[in-house]
C-alpha cells in the first residue's frame, strides 16, 4: 500500500510547483508518512532515487538540453540489455552485488541491501523457456515459468504457491516484469516492449514543447531499467498507471504542443 501511494506522490512532486498550496501539503504529508513508516523494501529506496534525479534535471535546467536527454535515453534503454547479455553469458552479473560490493549494507526495515534475489528468477525463466521450447514466442499469460524453487516449497508442504500445475513441475509468475514477459511472450514480446518504451520516450523527449513532458520521457527510460528487477504487471500498480498515462499524453498532439506556461496552467486546473 505504501509503495502504491509513494509512486503517485513522487510523480506529483514533479508538478508540485504548479499545484495550489492545499495540494502541495497533501503530497508532502504523504511523503513524510511514507518516509517514516513505509520504507520496508529495497525497491522503495530505489524508487526514491528516480524522482530525485528528475527533480535535479528540472530545477537545474538540465532537461532543457535535448542532446543530454537523448544521451540518457539511448544509454538507459540499451544498458540493461547489455548487462542482461553479460549476465547470461557469465561474464558479469550486476545483480550479484556481493561479488563487487565488499561491505554488505543492512537496513533495519529492508534487510541486507546487497542480497541477490533476482538472478534465480532469470535462471528459472530462461531454463523453462528453453526446456519447453517457447523462448521465441512465449507460452501466453495462461501459464507461468517452470519453477524448481516453488517445487521445493511444495515438497516441504507449502501447497498453493504455484500459479498452475502442468505435469509435475509447478509454474509461477514472479515479482520482476522482464522474466514474466519472456515467459508469456518470449523474445518477441520482449522486443515489442523495448520498442514501445523506446518509441514513446524518444517521442516525448524530442517532440514535446515543454520541459515537464521531457522529464516524463526520462521517467519512462528509468522505468524500463526498473522493469528488470520489479514492476511485475500482475496486479494494479501505480507505476504502470503513470507509464500508460505518460504514453497517453505523448499520443495527444494538443498536449505535446503546450509550452511550459500552458502546461503549468493545465496541471493547475487538473489538480484544482
What are these regions (language model features)?
Residues 1-105, 167-271:
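Hydrophobic transmembrane helix bundles of membrane-integrated enzymes that assemble
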Residues 109-185:
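Long extracytoplasmic/lumenal interhelical loops at the membrane interface
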Amino acid at each position: 500500500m505504501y509503495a502504491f501511494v509513494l509512486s503517485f506522490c513522487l510523480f506529483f512532486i514533479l508538478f508540485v510547483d504548479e499545484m495550489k498550496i492545499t495540494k502541495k501539503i497533501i503530497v508532502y504529508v504523504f511523503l513524510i508518512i511514507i518516509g517514516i513508516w513505509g520504507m520496508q523494501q529495497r525497491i522503495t529506496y530505489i524508487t526514491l532515487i528516480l524522482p530525485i534525479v528528475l527533480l535535479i534535471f528540472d530545477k537545474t535546467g538540465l532537461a532543457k538540453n535535448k542532446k543530454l536527454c537523448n544521451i540518457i535515453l539511448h544509454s538507459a534503454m540499451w544498458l540493461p540489455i547489455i548487462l542482461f547479455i553479460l549476465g547470461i553469458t557469465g561474464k558479469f552479473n550486476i545483480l550479484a552485488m556481493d561479488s563487487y560490493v565488499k561491505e554488505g549494507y543492512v537496513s533495519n526495515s529492508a534487510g541486507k541491501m546487497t542480497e541477490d534475489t533476482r538472478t534465480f528468477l532469470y535462471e528459472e525463466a530462461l531454463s523453462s523457456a528453453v526446456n519447453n521450447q517457447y523462448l521465441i514466442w512465449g507460452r501466453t499469460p495462461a501459464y507461468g515459468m517452470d519453477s524448481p524453487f516453488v517445487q521445493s516449497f511444495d515438497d516441504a508442504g507449502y501447497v498453493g504457491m504455484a500459479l498452475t500445475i502442468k505435469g509435475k513441475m509447478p509454474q509461477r509468475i514472479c515479482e520482476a516484469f522482464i522474466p514474466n514477459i519472456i515467459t508469456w511472450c518470449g523474445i518477441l514480446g520482449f522486443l515489442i516492449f523495448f520498442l514501445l518504451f523506446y518509441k514513446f520516450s524518444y517521442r516525448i523527449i524530442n517532440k514535446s514543447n515543454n520541459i515537464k513532458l521531457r522529464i516524463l520521457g526520462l521517467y519512462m527510460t528509468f522505468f524500463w531499467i526498473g522493469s528488470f528487477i520489479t514492476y511485475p504487471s500482475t496486479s494494479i500498480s501505480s507505476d504502470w498507471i503513470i507509464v500508460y498515462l505518460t504514453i497517453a499524453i505523448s499520443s495527444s498532439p494538443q498536449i505535446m504542443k503546450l509550452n511550459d506556461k500552458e502546461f503549468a496552467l493545465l496541471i493547475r486546473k487538473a489538480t484544482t
